[in-house]
Amino acid sequence: MMSTAAATTTHTIEARISLEDETRCQQILALWMAALNRYDATAMDALMRFPHVRLSAGKVTVYDTPGNNPMDLFDRLRQQDGWHHSAWNETKLVQSSPTKAHYAVRYTRYREDGSIIGIYDSLYVFSALDGDWRIQCRSSFGP
């Protein structure tokens, strides 16, 4: 129940991500998808902030350091579903401050013949330290 007292906020509408930083986050999302499709864990690590949190399939996984991103997920996807690549359908900034940004994203997983395996929604949380934006957390409805 909301009290009648004025609610306090952590930031104001004016205190949002700059256009330059928003562009950088969009670039990171493009680089992320390209690295994922190349099956390049090192490139993915370079775009992540550690510790990095992933919420998916009812589990919370914390990657404390680079080099711990298990690529076996993609091996399983290839074996189970014939996964070949993924693509963003939508990447939308939904909340931000000068040092944090929440992106609602939707992506599609495809087989080599172009048929669709599934379409999934996720939330990607970016954080900036000294102007260096990286993906800090991912919460996905996909496997």
What is the role of each PLM region?
Residues 63, 71, 110-113, 128, ...:
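A short local loop/turn or secondary-structure capping micro-motif enriched for an aromatic residue
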